[in-house]
Design a protein with these regions (language model features):
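"…together with the soluble PPM/PP2C metallo-phosphatase catalytic core" -> "…together
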Residues: 2-234
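C-terminal membrane-associated helical module and adjoining short loops/tails
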Residues: 1-5, 9, 215-326
Length: 326
């Protein structure tokens, strides 16, 4: 709690709020003129046309804080990768971009991230593995961004957690952007969605910090700061493979979508559950990590997996493995 209060009382974050709200108010007026609207379809969890792409403020505020408050020349490769992903993803929010082009942009961006952290010096097999993991994270975040508030709350929890480890002022810009976005998105009828640009940018920024922490500590356990999203994304893929579905196609098979759509639990409530679960896990993570006790963290993660599976099997039953008829 003290960390949260200290973070929110940090002077640069006030500047971030002003810029973020100004950008969002402007975007909400301009976006409809260019038809940057998310229109509901059979996969959607919303029923009203809504402005999308508002997550453009995430990479903008993050990059702005790096340039204004960071060291000269700092994070050049990271910002280049973030800019590339931001441009391609935002264009995808405006007009559909072919999957191959999006994947190509992701590969280049990950390559730039690797350059930032000198990953190219690693063994080839490890470079490939980590690259696949980061691209998987980027696409998982995109699929997980399907109901009001979920990206904003989960992103806020993750950004605060990362800031607890490393007081990087650029994260304050991201936190300010997330809070401003939540003002318009965390409601029954959202004023805007983050869009691909928001989800992809968050995943890329978080991947940088988690990989950085893993390198510095020589411990990959930091990836569990994304445990809740990781569990839902990975297990949903497994069930989709069992049902012989194309896992690259859009869908609404995630557990959060089931809760919001089939169980009719309010979007905001589901988003708070996901964010709170990750926040509580992170508290345990930090408590045991800084006591140099890794086993309890892994036990807690295993417990999350078991609870998640138990809930899905209990609530969804055989539909988890039955092929869906069209």
């Amino acid at each position: 709690m003290n960390l949260l209060l200290d973070t929110l009382s940090n002077k640069p974050i006030y500047f971030g709020w002003v810029v973020a709200f100004a950008l969002l108010f402007g975007y909400l007026k301009i976006a409809p003129q260019y038809n940057i609207i998310d229109k509901p379809n059979q996969r959607s969890s919303h029923t009203n046309p809504t402005i999308r792409g508002a997550g453009i403020i995430f990479p903008v505020l993050y990059a702005l804080f790096v340039l204004m408050f960071g060291h000269p020349g700092a994070l050049v490769d990271l910002i280049m990768g973030l800019t590339l992903l931001g441009v391609v993803s935002f264009y995808d929010d405006v007009k559909d971009v072919p999957f191959g082009l999006r994947l190509f942009a992701q590969l280049i961006a990950v390559g730039l991230l690797f350059n930032e952290l000198f990953v190219w010096l690693w063994p080839i097999w490890l470079i490939v593995f980590v690259g696949i993991l980061i691209i998987g994270t980027i696409n998982a975040f995109n699929f997980m961004d399907g109901i009001n508030g979920i990206s904003g709350i989960y992103g806020f929890v993750t950004a605060i957690s990362l800031y607890a480890v490393k007081q990087d002022i650029a994260l304050l810009g991201l936190i300010a952007a997330l809070m401003a976005f939540l003002f318009f998105n965390l409601r029954k009828k959202a004023k805007c969605f983050s869009g691909d640009v928001g989800a992809v940018s968050l995943a890329f920024i978080f991947s940088y910090y988690i990989l950085n922490f893993s390198i510095e500590s020589k411990n990959p356990i930091w990836v569990l700061l994304l445990a809740v999203y990781g569990i839902d994304a990975a297990i949903t893929i497994v069930f989709r493979l069992i049902r012989k579905e194309n896992i690259l196609r859009g869908h609404r098979s995630h557990f959060y979508q089931y809760l919001a759509n089939e169980r009719q639990i309010p979007h905001v409530a589901v988003s708070i559950i996901y964010g709170t679960t990750q926040a509580l896990f992170n508290v345990l993570f930090f408590y045991f990590y800084f006591k140099q006790q890794m086993a309890p963290i892994l036990y807690a993660f295993a417990g999350l997996v078991i609870i998640y599976l138990a809930l899905r099997i209990t609530l969804e039953g055989k539909t988890l493995v039955q092929q869906k008829t069209t």
